[in-house]
UniProtKB/Swiss-Prot annotation:
The record marks I856 as: Important for DNA bending. The modification Phosphothreonine is found at T282, T1205, T1244, T1327, T1343, T1470. Belongs to the type II topoisomerase family. Mg(2+) 1 binds at E461, D541. This is DNA topoisomerase 2-alpha. It comes from Homo sapiens (Human). Specifically inhibited by the intercalating agent amsacrine. Residues 1256-1272, 1491-1502 have a biased composition (Basic and acidic residues). Mg(2+) 2 binds at D541, D543. There is a cross-link at K1240 (Glycyl lysine isopeptide (Lys-Gly) (interchain with G-Cter in SUMO1)). The keyword Acetylation applies. Residues 455-572 form the Toprim domain. It catalyses: ATP-dependent breakage, passage and rejoining of double-stranded DNA. The lineage of its organism: Eukaryota, Metazoa, Chordata, Craniata, Vertebrata.
Amino acid sequence: MEVSPLQPVNENMQVNKIKKNEDAKKRLSVERIYQKKTQLEHILLRPDTYIGSVELVTQQMWVYDEDVGINYREVTFVPGLYKIFDEILVNAADNKQRDPKMSCIRVTIDPENNLISIWNNGKGIPVVEHKVEKMYVPALIFGQLLTSSNYDDDEKKVTGGRNGYGAKLCNIFSTKFTVETASREYKKMFKQTWMDNMGRAGEMELKPFNGEDYTCITFQPDLSKFKMQSLDKDIVALMVRRAYDIAGSTKDVKVFLNGNKLPVKGFRSYVDMYLKDKLDETGNSLKVIHEQVNHRWEVCLTMSEKGFQQISFVNSIATSKGGRHVDYVADQIVTKLVDVVKKKNKGGVAVKAHQVKNHMWIFVNALIENPTFDSQTKENMTLQPKSFGSTCQLSEKFIKAAIGCGIVESILNWVKFKAQVQLNKKCSAVKHNRIKGIPKLDDANDAGGRNSTECTLILTEGDSAKTLAVSGLGVVGRDKYGVFPLRGKILNVREASHKQIMENAEINNIIKIVGLQYKKNYEDEDSLKTLRYGKIMIMTDQDQDGSHIKGLLINFIHHNWPSLLRHRFLEEFITPIVKVSKNKQEMAFYSLPEFEEWKSSTPNHKKWKVKYYKGLGTSTSKEAKEYFADMKRHRIQFKYSGPEDDAAISLAFSKKQIDDRKEWLTNFMEDRRQRKLLGLPEDYLYGQTTTYLTYNDFINKELILFSNSDNERSIPSMVDGLKPGQRKVLFTCFKRNDKREVKVAQLAGSVAEMSSYHHGEMSLMMTIINLAQNFVGSNNLNLLQPIGQFGTRLHGGKDSASPRYIFTMLSSLARLLFPPKDDHTLKFLYDDNQRVEPEWYIPIIPMVLINGAEGIGTGWSCKIPNFDVREIVNNIRRLMDGEEPLPMLPSYKNFKGTIEELAPNQYVISGEVAILNSTTIEISELPVRTWTQTYKEQVLEPMLNGTEKTPPLITDYREYHTDTTVKFVVKMTEEKLAEAERVGLHKVFKLQTSLTCNSMVLFDHVGCLKKYDTVLDILRDFFELRLKYYGLRKEWLLGMLGAESAKLNNQARFILEKIDGKIIIENKPKKELIKVLIQRGYDSDPVKAWKEAQQKVPDEEENEESDNEKETEKSDSVTDSGPTFNYLLDMPLWYLTKEKKDELCRLRNEKEQELDTLKRKSPSDLWKEDLATFIEELEAVEAKEKQDEQVGLPGKGGKAKGKKTQMAEVLPSPRGQRVIPRITIEMKAEAEKKNKKKIKNENTEGSPQEDGVELEGLKQRLEKKQKREPGTKTKKQTTLAFKPIKKGKKRNPWSDSESDRSSDESNFDVPPRETEPRRAATKTKFTMDLDSDEDFSDFDEKTDDEDFVPSDASPPKTKTSPKLSNKELKPQKSVVSDLEADDVKGSVPLSSSPPATHFPDETEITNPVPKKNVTVKKTAAKSQSSTSTTGAKKRAAPKGTKRDPALNSGVSQKPDPAKTKNRRKRKPSTSDDSDSNFEKIVSKAVTSKKSKGESDDFHMDFDSAVAPRAKSVRAKKPIKYLEESDEDDLF
C-alpha cells in the first residue's frame, strides 16, 4: 500500500496542537509560581523565619526532670513550639518591669489535654477601644499582626518584647488561643478566643470588673504544625525549666507551676540548682561567687570542668548561646585571672585568655535597654556594651573571691598537664642504637644496645675538655664511653620556666642521648635497662665554676628523676689542681688546702717546681692518658646517703629556701673566719684516698665555695666599695702608674696579666668603662678618666665606643682617695704564687656610698644609691669631732631633679617638668637612671601614637637635649593638659621613680656578709675601721721614719768620725771593720732590719724562690748573715767633702723633725690632712670639668648673644612654671607598708606623719616665700627679678629658690675667670652640703642652722660662695618649685639677706642692680608661681601652693627647720658641689651653656631666657648678668 503524500503533514499539525496546549499550561504556571501571601499565610508557610524550626531536633539542653532536677541531657523537641511558649512566658515576666507591684506568675502545663496557661497579676492590658484601629487593645495586640507597645525606640525599655510578633505567633500556631485580662483602671474584664491558627476570632466578652489586675493567656498548640501527637516528656521538661528560669531571673515574683510554688528564692538559689551534687577536682562542693552588682546586673561564677559554660538572661529571655552581655562580664574576670595565672605560672606554658575562659562557668542575669538579637529566637544577644544602658563593674571583692574559688588552681593543673605532654614529646620511649641530630656527640659504640647499662657518658665543660677526654679514651676504649661537650652552665631546671626547659638544647640533648623519659620512675634495676647509658660522668675544671656545673647537673637529675641518684648514676672525673716535681719525682694535689698542708710539712718545699692547673685545657694529651690509665684515682662516685642529700640539693637550688641559703652561707663564712683566726687549715674533699663523695658533702664543702665566690664577685666590700674585678683594675693602674693615657683594650690585657684575672676580657673592659663613666646616674667620683666616648645618659652608658678606640688613665683623685702610704697596711692576696690585689683597699672616704653599689649574688643582693661627696666628708669630720653624723639623702652628680624620703630607706626621685602655656609643657630632667632614649621610646612615643588600649595623649614633642642635658617640649590639647595636671604631671609622664634601700648588704672587713639598716651604719663601720688603719699607718710611718732617721744619724756620725780620724778604715779587713763599728755603737742597717721585721723582704724572696732555686739559696744566705754595715761602708768617698757632710747633717735633722712632727699628730689629724688635700683637688677637677664643658661654645664678648640663643635651646625655658612633684599619702603609705615587710629592725624616723607635717610646712613656706619675695633681697632672688623684668608678667620657672640662682645667673656677662672667685666663696658654703634638702634654705637662713651641716665641714670646699652651698645652688638649678617647697624655708631667709652680699663678688652686680632685683622679685613672686602638679598653670604661685599642700615636696616651713631635716628632700645636685654651685647658678642663668652642667639647666633657663629678651631698662643689666653667669656655668 502506498503512503499518501499528505500524511506527514497531518502528523505535523497534531504535533503543533500539542505544543500549543503545553504553552498554555506554562503561561498558567507563572501565576502559580509568583504568588503573594498574606502575613498570616507567610508565617504558617515559612515558620522557621519567625519561630525557628518546626522539625524535631535532638540536642543537649538544660531541662528539669522531677526525679533529677535541673540537668543537662539530650532532648528531642521542636524549637518552634518551645519558642511560642517562651514568648508568652517572657511577656508575663516583662510585666514586672511595667508594674513593680506584680508578684505572681502561674504556669499550667496539661500535656493530656494539650493545654498551656500562663497567668500573671500586676497591671493588665488596657481594656479600652483603640481610636485609630477601632478595636479593643487586647484584641489588637493579640489578634492583629505587627502590633506592639515596643516600637518607640526612643523609649528605653528593659523588656523582652521587641518586634511585635511574640504573642501573635503563639496565637497563629495554636488551634485555640484565649486572652483574658482585667483592668481595674478601666473597670472591665476582656476575654476573647481565636481558633484555627488565628484564622477565626470568637466573640469578644466584656464584663464589668472591680478586682486586682491580671492577665491570663491559655492556648492549645497546633501539634500537627509541629509534627507531634502530644506534648511529650522532653518538651515539658524544657518548659518546666523555663518556669524555673523565670523564678530565678525575675526578682520578687513567686512562680507557681501546676499550682505548686517553685522553691526558688532568687538568682543565687536558682544557680545552686545547677551545681547541686557537682564537685571539684578535690571532691569538695564547687564554690560559687555571687555579686548583685546593681539593680540591673547579677553575676555568679564557679569553676567549670567541661569548657566554658554560661547560663544567662537578658530581660528574662534565656540567651542559651550567650552574647555580648556574657562576654562583657566574662572578659573582666578573664583579664584578672590571666594576670594571676601568669604570676603563678611564671615561665610555664603560655596561657591565653580563651584557655582561662574554658575553666569558667558564669551565670548572668541582666536588664538591658532595647536589646537586639541575631534572630527572632533570641538565643544570642548582639547589642554593643556601650548601648546597654548600664554598666557591670565587678568589685575587687568579687575578683578576689574569683581568684580563690578554684579556677586558678584548675588552670594551673591544666598547665602542668599540658607542659608534661609537651615534655614527653621530647623523649623517646624506645631505646635507639644510633642518635641523629647531635653533631658534637661522640657516642659509645655499645650505647643503646644490650650492654648499655655498662656505658658511661662523659659530659665535659666545653670543647677543649672534650678533646682531653677523647685523648684519654685511647686508653679505656670507645665501646663503653661516650663524650658530649656542654656549652657552659646548664639550666637550673628547678626554677626554670616550661618554655626555658622546652627550648634548652643542652637539656634536651642530654635526655635524648641518655634515653631519659619524664615522669618515669627508675626505682628498679630493670628500668635502667631502658636507658642508653648506665652512668653519667661529669668532667669539669677543678674551679668553682666547674663545681657549679656539677651541682646543676646533680640538680637536673634530682629534680626530675630522684631515684636515679640512689643507683650511683652520677660520678665525676677529677684532675690535679697543682703538680709539684723535683728531679724525676712528681706529686699531684686535687685541692689547694691539701697542697698547703704538704708545703707546711715539707721543709725544702721551695726546691720543688710547682705548676698550677687552671682548667682541663692546661693538661696535655699525655697527661690525659695518664689520668684515664689511673681511672680508680680520678673517678669519684657520688653516693646517696639518705634524706639529708635530698635536703642539701634542694637547699642549694630551690627558690623557696632563700633564707635557709643565707643561713648556710653565713655559717660557712663564720666557720672560715674562725679557722683563720685559730690557724686551722681549710676543709677539703679530694684527698689521696677519696673514692666516693656524698651529695651532702659535695653541696656543703664544694658547691658552697662557688656560692660564696659568686657573692664575692657580685657584692662589693664595705671598706673600698669595690668588687674583685674593679679592685684588680685599680691594682693594675696603681702598679703601672701611667703618666699617659692607655687604650682600654690594652689596659684590660695588662689587668689580666698583672692580677691573674681568669674570666673573659670583655667583662674586664666593661668594668674599666664603668669605672670611668661620669654621666648623671653613674659615678659621683670616677676613679678613671673617660678619654673618648664612654657612654652618656642618652643610652645609660650602652653607647660607649669600642674598647679599642677609647683611652683612660687614673684620675688625679684616685691616689688621694687611696693613698700609697696605706698600701703597707693592706693584706695582699696571692694567685698562682703571684702577688695580686689586696683583700681590699682602704680609701679615705667610703667609696661604696659615693658611687653606690648594685649586685645579685647567691642568697643576697645589694643595692646602695650614690651619696654626695662633701656631705660624707663633712659627716666624717663630725665623727672625728665626736658629733653625731647628719642624715643624708641619695645624691647623683649633676642631677637636677629632687630626691625625697618617704620612709626610712624609701625615697622618691622626681624629674623636672614645667608648664610653658595652656598646651605646652617642658620636661627638663628625668628620674635618675631613666635614660633619655629609653624614655622617648617607652613613654613619649606611645603617648604620641597611642596603643591598642590607650588613645594618644600628646599631639607632638620636640627634643632639645644634649648628651648631658634633657629637654623635651611636649604639646597637648588644653583639656588633656588640664586633666594631666589634675592627676599629676609627674605621674602621667612617669617622672617619678621609687628607690628602696632595704638590701644594703656588703662584705665587712673580715670577709663576712653584713646587712646594714641605714647608710649611717655603713659610715660608722667605715669610720671605725679607717681610724684604726690611720693608727696602723702612723705606726708604720713611725717605724719607717725612725729607721731612716737612725740610718741618716749613723751615716752622719760615721762621716764626722772619719773626718775627725776617730775611725780608720783604710787597709783593714772587713771583719775587723765590722767589729770596730759594733764596738763604737753603730747599728746594723736600720732600714733593712725594720723591713725584715715587717716581713716584707721574706715575702718578696719567697716569690722569687719558687722560680729560681739558686736565687733563693743566695737570698737565704744573705738573710742568715750577721749585721750589715754596707750602708756605711758603701758610701762614696765624696761624702767626706764639706758640702756632702753638711747636706747629710741637714737631711738627718730634717728627718728627725719629720719624725717629731708625726709623733705629735693623732690618726685624726692625718685623716683631716688627707681630706683637705682631696677636697682641694676635687675642686680643681670640677673647675676643669666646667672649663671643658665651655670649650667649643660660641665666642665671648660681642658674640655673647649668639651663645645665649644656642644655650636657650637646650636650657629650661625661663617662662615655665615649675611643677612641684607631688608626694601623695598613698605613696607614703605604700612605702611604710614595704618597710614593715622588708625591714626587720624598723626605723620610724621617716614616718608618714612627719612627711605630712613637712608637706604642711612646705605649703606655708611657699606662701611666705611668695609674699616675701617682692621685698626679699636674697642673692638668688635678685636674679629672678631680672627675669621678671624682662617679661613683666612671669617669673623664672624656678621661682623663689631658683630666683636666688637667677640672680647669680644674671651675671652671665661675667667672664669665666670671675667664676673662680665665686667658687672660693662657695667653698665656705659647701660645708653645708650634708643637708641636701635644705641647702638653699640653710644657706640663706641662719635660723636653720640645725638643718645644715656645720661650717667646719665646709673647709675642704674653698670654692663655694659663702652664702650658697653647693647643694643649695644645685637645688635651685633643678627645680624652682622644689626649692621653693623645700627651700622656701631657706629661700625666705635668703631673700631677707642683702642681695648685694652674694652677688657682688660673683656676678659683679652694681648697687642699683640689687634694687632692681628686689622689685623684680616682687613681681616675679606674683607672676611666676611654681605650679603644683595639680594646680592651674596660670595661677599665682601663692594660690597654687596654698591650694595643694599635698603636691609640695614636703619641705617644712622656715619655722620648722628640724622637721625639714626629718622629711629630708634632696634638691638637684651639681657635679661641682659647693665650689661650682655658685658658678652653676650663674651658668644656669645662661641658657646656652646648660650642656655644661646639667644641674644648672633649670636655673640657667630662667636667666638665660630672660637676659636675651630683656625688654625693660632693668632687663639690660640682667642680660649682662646672664651672660656672665653663663660663662660661669661653663666652668
